[in-house]
Amino acid sequence: MARIAGIDLPPNKRAVISLQYIYGIGNKSAQDIIAAAGIDPTTRTKDLTEEQARKIREIIEASYKVEGDLRREVTMNIKRLMDLGCYRGLRHRKGLPVRGQRTHTNARTRKGPKRGIVRAKPAAPAR
């Protein structure tokens, strides 16, 4: 089983598909990496030689920001926006959509579950 960027890649999938299990590598990036390594795109992960796995590892380390580094960078970018107090930062801080979507209806994913209106309990009858 190939282990790249701290992730165990699934052995029975094609190398292009299994590379996408790494956070920060999508379809196009995976295809570019396989092409740069000179590997046939139909090769299964279990059929990769140690040399091919090493070549993929080197390409990823040299050219891509993946896993923990990428997550940390994204988090720091959001934190920077919030510290600046700009509009996008305020939207992040309030947990609302950042990119201009409507919030009158929809936006439930960002806003969380609905909070119902609390009604007053009916008064108990006098005795």
Swiss-Prot record:
GO terms for cellular component: cytosol; small ribosomal subunit. It comes from the Bacteria. Residues 96-127 are annotated as: Disordered. Pfam families: Ribosomal_S13. GO terms for molecular function: rRNA binding; structural constituent of ribosome; tRNA binding. Keywords: Ribonucleoprotein, Ribosomal protein, RNA-binding, rRNA-binding, tRNA-binding. One of its GO terms (biological process) is translation. The keyword RNA-binding applies. Disulfide bonds: none annotated. Residues 96-118 have a biased composition (Basic residues). Located at the top of the head of the 30S subunit, it contacts several helices of the 16S rRNA. In the 70S ribosome it contacts the 23S rRNA (bridge B1a) and protein L5 of the 50S subunit (bridge B1b), connecting the 2 subunits; these bridges are implicated in subunit movement. Contacts the tRNAs in the A and P-sites. NCBIfam families: uS13_bact. Belongs to the universal ribosomal protein uS13 family. Part of the 30S ribosomal subunit. Forms a loose heterodimer with protein S19. Forms two bridges to the 50S subunit in the 70S ribosome. HAMAP family: Ribosomal_uS13 (MF_01315). This is Small ribosomal subunit protein uS13. The lineage of its organism: Bacteria, Pseudomonadati, Myxococcota, Myxococcia, Myxococcales. The gene is rpsM.
